[in-house]
Amino acid sequence: MSQNQEISKKEQYNLNKLQKRLRRNVGEAIADFNMIEEGDRIMVCLSGGKDSYTMLEILRNLQQSAPINFSLVAVNLDQKQPGFPEHVLPEYLEKLGVEYKIVEENTYGIVKEKIPEGKTTCSLCSRLRRGILYRTATELGATKIALGHHRDDILQTLFLNMFYGGKMKGMPPKLMSDDGKHIVIRPLAYCREKDIQRFADAKAFPIIPCNLCGSQPNLQRQVIADMLRDWDKRYPGRIETMFSAMQNVVPSHLCDTNLFDFKGITHGSEVVNGGDLAFDREEIPLQPVGWQPEEDENQLDELRLNVVEVK
């Protein structure tokens, strides 16, 4: 066997493992939050970025073996940004045989009119886009709206709200839409961004840049993202532990009177969640909670994944 053939086999092996991991992560999120039910029509919001492409690919994969029946319809919002390649998504989706709808709305013109030059337009653009997607979901008869936010997005939002908003508020894997009519789901909630990036590179998705509008990036979010990436590099397992913490909230040991009845504590009240452990020595695990090193972690970094199809 030649060296090139050996490398190709390793690439294929690692890509298969990567897809299985993403599939497992998505499957667990769907099960934990009851994201998809029998007969659901899922509107998959496709932006042309790595996250939404990966979400569509994994949902299509799960659809083939899921114990329930559900359908997918991909939706892209063409916001009339200069240079937007209108042909890319239709060609890609037609090749896959996926039902889709391209919604054309000149939100770019509205945003440029309302936001001063050089300012971040993402907030207004997001609000406009959200309203259009809700309307489209109604028109298509969709029961769920799937967005491509992943675990890193959720953690970034948590820290943004803590650092700048004074709230412990993240990005829920499942929620009711602002108009009270649609259920929004985030199937990639348990997926790592670096896994999604590797998968997108390997599959050679036709990525559409997200900066066509010319808007400046959200500086605060970028600072948080850089901080989390640095932590992940220097302290393996810290990201996993923080995400686990979001799933293990103890209201009695925080300070929110809306979540726990502190005023109701009187003599004779029972001990809740271990009582006062503030001055006790905590038993700190040797490894971060929720973290298991991937056996192929180094291999995935070393190998260039260029296999397009997973058998």
UniProtKB/Swiss-Prot annotation:
The entry's localization annotation reads:
Cytoplasm
Motif PP-loop motif: list the residue ranges: 47-52
Binding of [4Fe-4S] cluster: at which residues?
122, 125, 213
Its annotated pathway?
A: tRNA modification
Enzyme kind, highest EC tier: transferase
Q: What is its EC number?
A: 2.8.1.-
The stretch of residues making up the signal peptide is none
Q: Name one GO biological process term.
A: tRNA thio-modification
How does the cofactor attach, per the note?
Binds 1 [4Fe-4S] cluster per subunit. The cluster is chelated by three Cys residues, the fourth Fe has a free coordination site that may bind a sulfur atom transferred from the persulfide of IscS.
> Entry's Pfam families?
ATP_bind_3
Function (record text): Catalyzes the ATP-dependent 2-thiolation of cytidine in position 32 of tRNA, to form 2-thiocytidine (s(2)C32). The sulfur atoms are provided by the cysteine/cysteine desulfurase (IscS) system.
List the HAMAP family hit by this protein, alphabetically. TtcA
What is the name of the protein in this document?
Answer: tRNA-cytidine(32) 2-sulfurtransferase
